[in-house]
Amino acid sequence: MFMSRMLEEIRQQPEALERTFASEMRRAEKFKRFVEKRRPKLIVLVARGTSDNAALFGRYLLEITTGIPVSLAAPSIETLYKARVNYSGALVVAVSQSGESTDTNLILEHARERGALTLGITNESGSSLARLAEHVLLVRAGKERSVAATKTYTGQLLLFYLLAYALGGRIRPDDLARIPEAVRGALALEDEIDALSERYRFMRYAVVVGRGLNYSNAFEFALKLMETCYVVAERFSSADFLHGPIALVEPSFPVFAFAPPGVTWESIGGTLDKLRSLKAEIVAISDPGNREIEARATRTIRLKSKLKEVLTPIPYIVPAQMFAACLAAKKGLDPDQPRTLKKVTLTL
């Protein structure tokens, strides 16, 4: 098997998550004490690329566990249209692997000037973002050399759990401490996933579906297929997919689905039933206890750990990351250096 940097960094995730949890739990506790005196009525998240997918997860997690409304910022409203958004009383959270995203940092700077409480989530402690934000949570992933972000994405997700905890959300730190071991279990599926990827060597298009807390993973998996494998990959909520896009599906059309246990299963299962009737080729990522999936999916990637739905997003993205890395190798592509891409992208 070709050993890309991307695959190396995927394998580093359990230790990176353990470092992040051990170090940033203290910062989260400190922020928890601070925010008790200044509880925000609104949270605004700003990010680009993979970090934007992490922010989408943050929106679901924060609203579900804290009840505080969350908005995803559209940077062009300020950077291009020059609107002066009133951030007074809000918590504005900027998410950036490098901490050097121009538009993300500009929004954070404006927000702080206009009365917002600001927090940065980044992998770089010496970055512009870390200097601009009043409070910082650091991804302790170490240097990420592959252009395709993997270990920093899961680190960002973990920090959103810590942020939810700090804001009084229904999050138990003891539960979070189980996530790295669940990721180790997912990594043990590498040979199985490498063999599976061979079947899709000539895949040119695909759809990825998820819902709820794993909806962001559908975006992230699709992004990895696009940037490392050059597959045209669309991503949808399992509910939204039925409102038009399902017309794309014909026999053998490839669909990848995140199918965790919990409140989203009925919706996802219903969508898979419909896809099965259309003879789609369905690959589902699910848990070891879901026996209903066998009748719905063409192939199933089963994680080794049975987790509550709220804890599934980090371990569930790992098989998808490995699949993209393995498929890129099967296609003769270098996932570490996708054409026309750089590690840090500057936009306004």
Q: For each predicted feature, which ranges?
A:
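Peripheral docking tails and interdomain loops at the edges
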Residues: 306-348
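Extended hydrophobic-aromatic, low-complexity segments
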Residues: 216-220, 233-235, 244-245, 264-270, ...
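Hydrophobic membrane-spanning alpha-helices of multi-pass integral membrane proteins
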Residues: 253-261, 316-317
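Short, local alpha-helical segments
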Residues: 253, 300-310
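Conserved phosphate/anionic-ligand binding catalytic regions in large, soluble enzymes, centered on
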Residues: 53-58, 218-227, 317-322
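Active-site phosphate/pyrophosphate-binding segments
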Residues: 2-44, 135-254, 264, 331-348
